[in-house]
Design a protein with these regions (language model features):
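AMP-forming adenylation/ATP pyrophosphatase catalytic core
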Residues: 2-10, 14-62, 78-84, 114-116, ...
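Core alpha/beta nucleotide-donor-binding catalytic domains of modification enzymes
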Residues: 24-237
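Electropositive, surface-exposed helix/loop patches at the edges of structured domains
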Residues: 143-157, 252-269
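Surface-exposed helix-capping loop/turn segments at secondary-structure junctions
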Residues: 146-148, 245, 310
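Inter-helical turn/loop segments and adjacent helix faces that build the functional surface
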Residues: 241-253
């Protein structure tokens, strides 16, 4: 599967795109050689003498990723593993495998253990959301300590399909339906990470063949077959049902839709530079005079660049309500004990103090 994205240096004739190019990855996987053009293009964007963090769970995909990176000459790797403490001895065995792999390769390995279930309960989040939050906080901590801000992840095309479907049924706009980018930026705890997903255009089947061919050791997460997690239900129930209803593999169509949404998203991102900034916020009059669709996009971009967690168009709607209101100064609540306030013709954000209270 090749979605041939042409933004952020990921497609078209840009020679820097090939780290994430399906054609080159397939060449590596099936021919056991690195094409000279591939090697040169990788070095031009992601030099092999730089350091990279690699998220390694011990599962099939991340162990294949680790093998791939090593076989293509990436030696300055820091393995990052999170023990979610969800599966008892099984979680500990995952950690042991990753640590053993790091030792055998002579690579540093950073490990973090966290009671994800307890964190989920305390923060009123799903297990999936809590685990993701813990992982990225850990990644940002390692990135800050090691001064290495490039993180390589093992997401593949099947993961992309699941992500697109989840976002679609949540009512996401083009940003959500476009799925994950092969190369993107994410700010966590004021640390800007560059996320790199070399396998995003490869199917799970292709990775399975690679693992089998190279006899790569990995741990099978049996919880992937359980249905408590939304992503598992999407993978195990919804996708097979859709394939049966449409009598075809739905992956190409979903990825094609994601690509079209990505192009629309690309245009919208170009408009985000037009944020009507004023003092420490945004100019209310300018926002009121914008077309609704553009204003929604700009407000969402503003929230995300400001580090407001878990924000979407529902938060944008709340801000729009106080924005267009003719009442005196108005305020609305946002996730993470943040607030948006309109006062004296300026829309601005209030942030919690170190204790998470008393927004300032």
């Amino acid at each position: 599967v090749n979605t041939n994205r042409d933004s952020e240096g990921l497609g078209g004739s840009d020679p820097c795109c090939n780290l994430c190019s399906t054609a080159y990855l397939v060449d590596v996987i099936h021919h056991e050689q690195i094409n000279a053009t591939f090697a040169n293009s990788v070095s031009s964007r992601f030099p092999k003498d730089e350091s990279y963090l690699v998220a390694v769970s011990g599962g099939r995909d991340s162990m294949a990723l680790l093998h791939f990176l090593q076989s293509t000459g990436y030696q300055n790797l820091v393995l990052c593993h999170v023990n979610h403490c969800l599966r008892g001895a099984e979680s500990d065995a995952d950690q042991a495998l990753v640590e053993e792999a790091a030792k055998s390769l002579g690579l540093p390995c950073e490990v973090h253990s966290s009671d994800v279930a307890a964190h989920a309960a305390a923060s009123s989040q799903s297990i999936e959301a809590a685990a993701r939050e813990i992982r990225y906080r850990f990644f940002s901590d390692v990135a800050s300590a090691s001064n290495c801000k490039q993180l390589i992840l093992a997401h593949h095309a099947d993961d992309q399909v699941e992500t697109v479907l989840i976002n679609f049924f949540r009512g996401s706009g083009s940003r959500g339906i476009s799925g994950m980018d092969q190369i993107s930026q994410r700010v966590v705890n004021q640390v800007e990470l560059t996320l790199i997903r070399p396998f995003l255009n490869l199917s799970r089947e292709a990775i399975d063949r690679y693992v089998s061919k190279h006899d790569i050791s990995f741990r099978e997460d049996e919880s992937n077959a359980e249905e408590f997690a939304l992503r598992n239900r999407i993978r195990n129930r919804l996708i097979p049902t859709l394939a049966e209803v449409f009598e075809r593999d739905i992956q190409p169509a979903v990825l094609r839709s994601a690509e079209l949404a990505h192009r629309a998203e690309q245009w919208a991102r170009n408009q985000e530079a037009e944020l009507p900034r004023k003092e420490n916020g945004l100019d209310v009059s300018s926002l009121r005079n914008m077309p609704d669709a553009l204003r929604d996009r700009l407000l969402l971009a503003w929230l995300r660049e400001s580090g407001i967690p878990d924000c979407g168009f529902s938060e944008v709607a709340k801000i729009t309500e106080i924005l267009i209101s003719e009442s005196k100064p108005a305020k609305t609540n946002l996730p993470g004990n943040h607030h948006a306030r309109r006062r004296a013709g300026i829309l601005f954000l209030e942030f919690p103090d170190a204790e998470g209270e008393n927004p300032k």
